[in-house]
């Protein structure tokens, strides 16, 4: 089991400031069409983000570089050689110029063997936080699956064993895939959490500024980008009561975001300045409730009848006043309060604030709910018009709170 601090770290939203290089071969393959390449990369990033959402990671594209003149280092078919060259180029050239958490080389070269991608495992926030993916198929979703897979390796996730499952499949970390992968398996999530707690990568905890993002804003990707006030996902998935998921704008001030649950609760309204509903607030203590049968106390409406029903069941109600007069005796079970270990009898006006008496409906008995010390009337219970129980006495509701 994890410590609370470990759980906080795992639950924290994480952001990968992501830099993509498109090499010269890929540029030529797409007929020197930079706008088309950009759209393709933006679509890939969006697809990758959808896959990483359950892991609480957002991929923020903070740089896209297309090598339209020539490659800045030699891109070779040997995947491991190109990965090493890319790592060195990022370290010496890219990082001094543009800080990033992770960089990807998207290449048009045909990598040796069956490989379409390669990554350093468990390397985020280090000098080895890079991976290479071959743009091997016109289907964007297939290449985006490979991007997700290789970035998964950077995040300490291993290939899935035969016992790892995800429904619907196929799983992202399968060694061989023919169809676009759907989601991470339970094995992948376990690997990722173990990696996080072992290596504690810190660079993914800071949230990039919306002005740093180079991809166009997408309403519904859970990330507040330029022109958006909030982003809580799709309208079906949105959990933020004061964010309009369709427009990514705050709901107007005064829109009800949480209805009153009962008459001792208050409705909450959006402020117009936040995506979240304000903290749940309660009706003030002493406010009449349940058709004047009680007065609100800490968000509840305590009455003697409700106490009897809660303890004994729906066939019971509060006893007639004659039963409560027994509380003036001050003996074993019938008293108002304790002082220094002594049971203090009730004054006549306080009898309904002492021991609780219940009656089965249509009978005249003075029943005491089973408890060796007797059950006392709850604080805040109505004991007369404008009167409530406080510390075993029946006092004016105005002075009680």
Swiss-Prot record:
Binding site for Ca(2+) 3: 265-266, 268, 280
Domain of life the protein comes from: Eukaryota
The Peptidase M12B domain, residue ranges: 14-208
UniProt entry tagged with the keyword Cell membrane: no
EC annotation from Swiss-Prot or TrEMBL: 3.4.24.-
Disulfide topology: 125-203, 164-187, 166-171, 219-248, 230-243, 232-238, 257-277, 264-296, 289-301, 308-358, 323-366, 336-346, 353-389, 383-394
Active site: 150
Keyword line: Calcium, Disulfide bond, Glycoprotein, Hemostasis impairing toxin, Hydrolase, Metal-binding, Metalloprotease, Platelet aggregation inhibiting toxin, Protease, Secreted, Toxin, Zinc
Protein name (Swiss-Prot/TrEMBL): Hemorrhagic metalloproteinase-disintegrin-like kaouthiagin
Subcellular localization: Secreted
């Amino acid at each position: 089991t994890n410590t609370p601090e470990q759980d906080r770290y795992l639950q924290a939203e994480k952001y990968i400031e992501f830099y993509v290089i498109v090499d010269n071969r890929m540029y030529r393959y797409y007929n020197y069409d930079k706008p088309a390449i950009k759209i393709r990369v933006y679509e890939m990033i969006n697809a990758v983000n959808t896959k990483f959402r359950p892991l609480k990671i957002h991929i923020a594209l903070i740089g896209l570089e297309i090598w339209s003149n020539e490659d800045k280092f030699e891109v070779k078919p040997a995947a491991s050689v190109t990965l090493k060259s890319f790592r060195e180029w990022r370290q010496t050239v890219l990082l001094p110029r543009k800080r990033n958490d992770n960089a990807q080389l998207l290449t048009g070269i045909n990598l040796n063997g069956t490989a379409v991608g390669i990554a350093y495992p468990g390397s985020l926030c280090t000098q080895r936080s890079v991976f290479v993916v071959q743009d091997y198929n016109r289907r964007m979703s297939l290449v985006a699956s490979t991007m997700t897979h290789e970035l998964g390796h950077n995040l300490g996730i291993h290939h899935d064993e035969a016992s790892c499952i995800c429904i619907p499949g196929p799983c992202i970390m399968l060694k061989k895939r023919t169809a676009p992968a759907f989601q991470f398996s339970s094995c992948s999530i376990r690997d990722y959490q173990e990696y996080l707690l072992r290596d504690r990568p810190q660079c993914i905890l800071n949230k990039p500024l919306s002005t740093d993002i180079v991809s166009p804003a997408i309403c519904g990707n859970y990330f507040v980008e330029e022109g958006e006030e909030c982003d809580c996902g799709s309208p079906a998935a949105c959990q933020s009561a004061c964010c309009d998921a369709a427009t990514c704008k705050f709901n107007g001030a005064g829109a009800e975001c949480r209805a009153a649950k009962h008459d001792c609760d208050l409705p909450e309204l959006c402020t117009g300045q936040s995506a979240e509903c304000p903290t749940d607030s309660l009706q003030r203590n002493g406010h009449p409730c349940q058709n004047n049968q009680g007065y609100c106390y800490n968000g509840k409406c305590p009455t003697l009848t409700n106490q009897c029903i809660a303890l004994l069941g729906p066939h019971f109600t509060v006893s007639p006043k004659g039963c409560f007069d027994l509380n003036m005796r001050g003996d074993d079970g019938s008293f108002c309060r304790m002082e220094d270990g002594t049971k203090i009898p009730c004054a006549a006006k306080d009898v309904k604030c002492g021991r609780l008496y219940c009656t089965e409906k249509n009978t005249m008995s003075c029943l005491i709910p089973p408890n060796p010390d007797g059950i006392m009337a709850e604080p805040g219970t109505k004991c007369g018009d404008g009167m409530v129980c406080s510390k075993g006495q029946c006092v004016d509701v105005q002075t009680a709170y």
